[in-house]
From Swiss-Prot:
UniProt site positions, description: Transition state stabilizer: 34, 256
Keywords of this entry: Amino-acid biosynthesis, Arginine biosynthesis, ATP-binding, Cytoplasm, Kinase, Nucleotide-binding, Transferase
Species per Swiss-Prot/TrEMBL record: Rhodopseudomonas palustris (strain BisB5)
Molecular-function GO terms, alphabetical: acetylglutamate kinase activity; ATP binding
InterPro entries: AceGlu_kinase-like_sf (IPR036393), AcgluKinase_fam (IPR004662), ArgB (IPR037528), Asp/Glu/Uridylate_kinase (IPR001048), NAGK-C (IPR041727)
Keyword Methyltransferase: no
Protein name, entry field: Acetylglutamate kinase
Length: 298
């Protein structure tokens, strides 16, 4: 690891001065940040992310953090001798698995991230979509083509949910009051059943309900790539749909982009897919001229 470059006091002042108009743009605005399990990395990376979130709050931005936890769930399931199974990019979640998912997301990752933010000087509040019936969901359904028969079949994903409604009562008590909501992507059904919700989908639903200024999806790739594997810095909804249709956007990037489109259609001003492993990725996107990742807009 190389030492960080030394920045003179004058250059530090210049950087802060150049950030001012960007800070003013997001003054008192709500930014929803999805912090993916793959983006979390080592403890030092998570603590650096937490400090950046506190900095946002200190500059009058209202951050709302939604975290994932796929790798951490997989590690716990493996430790307990439970096989991880996926269909259509979603974890098949049976009765035993949903208990472990809830334990890891709401009990471990959530409280750890809350601790890091509080350690950095913030006031984080750890919640999940079940708290206050914040996010209600219904059972998710997916279809897949059987490779042998070529017949499309419905896949039973178990306790995997799709958000149906977001109740902002609880979040509105926190946002704008120097409190930073940290949300685990769990939801409840109308009958009280716990559902595991894809973190991107959960973040998109929350951002849409809040009419957030920005939704940032932190992942482990630079953003949306073209067929030459070069970053596409900006896309409209129309452009994004074309790239899905022609196969440029494929695999796991499709549901991420579909989440972006949904959030935009619900009133979010802009959505960015960016590499959360880049140091200070959130600050680079919000407070610099060039930004980072792929911005998707109407």
């Amino acid at each position: 690891m190389t030492d960080a470059p030394v920045i003179s006091p004058i250059d530090q002042a210049r950087i802060l001065s150049e950030a001012l108009p960007h800070m003013q743009r997001y003054d008192e605005e709500t930014i929803v940040i999805k912090y993916g399990g793959h983006a979390m990395g080592a403890e030092n990376d998570a603590k650096a992310f937490a400090r950046d979130i506190v900095l946002l709050e200190q500059t009058a931005v209202n951050p709302v953090v939604v975290h994932g936890g796929g790798p951490q769930i997989a590690t716990m399931l493996k430790r307990l001798g439970i096989k991880s199974e996926f269909a259509a990019g979603l974890r098949i979640t049976d009765g035993a698995t949903i208990e472990i998912v809830e334990m890891v997301l709401a009990g471990s990752i959530n409280k750890q991230l809350v601790g890091y933010i509080n350690e950095a000087g913030g006031k984080a509040v750890g919640l999940c979509g079940k708290d206050g019936n914040m996010v209600t969901a219904s059972k998710a359904t997916r279809t897949m083509v059987d490779p042998d028969s070529r017949i499309e079949e419905v896949v039973d994903l178990g306790f995997v949910g799709e958000p149906e409604k977001v109740d902002l009562t609880l979040l509105n008590q926190l946002i704008g009051h120097e409190l930073i909501p940290v949300l685990a992507p769990l939801a409840t059904s109308a009958t009280g059943q716990t559902f595991n919700v894809n973190a991107d989908t959960f973040a998109g639903a929350v951002a849409g309900a809040l009419k957030a200024k920005r939704l940032l999806l932190l992942t482990d790739v630079p953003g949306v790539l073209d067929k030459s594997k070069q970053l596409i810095p900006e896309l409209s909804i129309k452009d994004a749909r074309k790239l899905i249709a022609d196969g440029t956007i494929s695999g796991g990037m499709i549901p991420k982009v579909e989440t972006c489109i949904y959030a935009l259609e619900q009133g979010v001003e802009g959505v960015v897919i960016l590499d959360g492993k880049v140091p200070h990725a959130v600050l680079l996107e919000l407070f610099t001229n060039q930004g980072t990742g792929t911005l998707i807009h109407k």
